[in-house]
């Protein structure tokens, strides 16, 4: 059908594929004709935001992507960094937000499966998983259902496939009601002599389909992930994939065995957009074409048409390009593992994706048109910050009631500082996530150094590897964290995003790890709305600056936009802008690490970093005063670098016995968490002169960057304080000493006026049981 003939589709049919009228006109121009149904579907998924980043690509160009340890940056299935000693780490973060909103168990489970495939497709064995989760208020029954389902899905897939879930974060806020965020990060250690890339090459080389069969599950998942959610989204359950973790375990082993033969030229996971994405991306990256015969594809359902084959997102499937003549060698490996493996196509010289079905051409599209030369929207940025931000920035702590050493009066009732601390510890965002991580197998593979909740970052031991005829013994480990304070980013996307990077690096430094590199997951609302695009643009600017300042290049990641829920009136309610940073760090000696809990009674407690904090954007302000306003703390990167380096070097010198980032809830919450992690009390004296410069609640619960709480053996006090004076000047404070197991957390002024005295038992009850109580378990 020529380009001048009438379109064979109605505007509604075109819109149903996620294609705008002007995009359809561009498709017709490029093809020189109208597309058929299968081709329209292919363009719909490949031109979705989920696949082509048409609104975010110009912003992502700001990110630093190179560095001395970066082996593979953005553009491949996962980033790879050099750990030294012949060890290489692959890592990546991805989202499965929309599927988890309509089918939480399978949505979250297949999110785990998809990110694991990104890792082992590179030739790396998965060694760890982390997750970053966001939900609405835990008092809401719908949130409880989503939360329970997501956690069950993550634990089911990860536990069955045998990869430990070693860390993560969980936030609860009404901003995520109906639109949860499920971001999953995976790490893998390279096992193959060469990193496996995804660009096809070698004209005449066979194209192999391996793994599971193809069905109708996950139809149009990429387009589904690029639209707002509504009450009718439950009807989109067919767009949610169904995973098989036991099959994935076999796929891991078969792929790694196949890669080691040297018979594989390129490999690509069939994730979003399934066969369409894998064929077009492999062809475009290699500057070649791929011809694929759908009649060769193993199916689990009868009567499938090309549109369904091409858009199916059935899980646990891969596409390989093999060296000609060695295809049977690979097929035998997959059959031995009980998996499908067939030659389904060929690499061709013409740079097109040609799909055959029942002896005829079902689709024929230039590969670049699908995977590289896709639409790009450079939107106009607001000339000034939006009104909601300007109003929030006008807030001042002067509007809060007056503080005294006894507490603060809220709505006519005096609340003591002790009561406020217990309330914060009982807040689901701050409280222990033991209800979550007890469902995860976090020790499978026997390389997990810290149990979840025991340190500010996960630490994984690097076991001796057999490769290329030698055994590599090492004391090295990797640390990993996922972080984002979305309230900070909502109130000031630029400063908030910088703070995300700083906190991730700080968490790694608290376990003694040198921050190396970043993978990011950008979760935002609609970029087509001026406020949404302003938030996205400013956050990307902040992330880029933070990564440059802390020398942590970005190796890749994921963009998830249109995270909005339509209310009953049809008005879109966007989530908080949530740029999650996954960061990895290197530990050269696993005997030189520490957790967040106090270790020994009599150890001296110090606060490294700035003493001045703010209540703007704080957990205290949101929880106790029900106010989301103010500006988040501004990041001082010079101080951040110095504080983090002092912490790392203190750990390496065996001076620092515990280290904990002061984050949500401020200093006193950090003190309480260190008491609970070590099951030891503490006696703290806060300088009363500080309260002349700051409100008392700012001193206790204010938040700020570059602040780390550490404990040091009393025998090392003189050496440590000399070191602090040399490297931090006045930017540190001695706070007090660690108590016994039966001691309280006692916070006093320097003239011994009591501010807080609370037992470990009482804190423990609020902190450990907050989530279970709300779930009525």
UniProtKB/Swiss-Prot annotation:
Pfam families: AIRS, AIRS_C, FGAR-AT_linker
InterPro entries in alphabetical order: PRibForGlyAmidine_synth_PurL, PurL_linker, PurM-like_C_dom, PurM-like_C_sf, PurM-like_N, PurM-like_N_sf
Binding site for ATP: 53, 92, 520, 557
Chemical reaction(s) catalysed: N(2)-formyl-N(1)-(5-phospho-beta-D-ribosyl)glycinamide + L-glutamine + ATP + H2O = 2-formamido-N(1)-(5-O-phospho-beta-D-ribosyl)acetamidine + L-glutamate + ADP + phosphate + H(+)
Pathway: Purine metabolism; IMP biosynthesis via de novo pathway; 5-amino-1-(5-phospho-D-ribosyl)imidazole from N(2)-formyl-N(1)-(5-phospho-D-ribosyl)glycinamide: step 1/2
Keyword Membrane assigned: no
Localization, UniProt: Cytoplasm
Residues reported to bind Mg(2+) 2: 118, 269
Active site: 50, 96 (proton acceptor)
Annotated residues for binding of Mg(2+) 1: 94, 558
GO MF term set: ATP binding; magnesium ion binding; phosphoribosylformylglycinamidine synthase activity
Domain of life: Bacteria
Keywords for this protein: ATP-binding, Cytoplasm, Ligase, Magnesium, Metal-binding, Nucleotide-binding, Purine biosynthesis
Enzyme Commission number: 6.3.5.3
GO cellular component term of the entry, any: cytoplasm
Annotated function: Part of the phosphoribosylformylglycinamidine synthase complex involved in the purines biosynthetic pathway. Catalyzes the ATP-dependent conversion of formylglycinamide ribonucleotide (FGAR) and glutamine to yield formylglycinamidine ribonucleotide (FGAM) and glutamate. The FGAM synthase complex is composed of three subunits. PurQ produces an ammonia molecule by converting glutamine to glutamate. PurL transfers the ammonia molecule to FGAR to form FGAM in an ATP-dependent manner.
Similarity remark: Belongs to the FGAMS family.
Subunit structure: Monomer. Part of the FGAM synthase complex composed of 1 PurL, 1 PurQ and 2 PurS subunits.
Name of the molecule in the record: Phosphoribosylformylglycinamidine synthase subunit PurL
Native source species: Trichormus variabilis (strain ATCC 29413 / PCC 7937)
Upper classification of the organism: Bacteria, Bacillati, Cyanobacteriota, Cyanophyceae, Nostocales
Gene behind this protein: purL
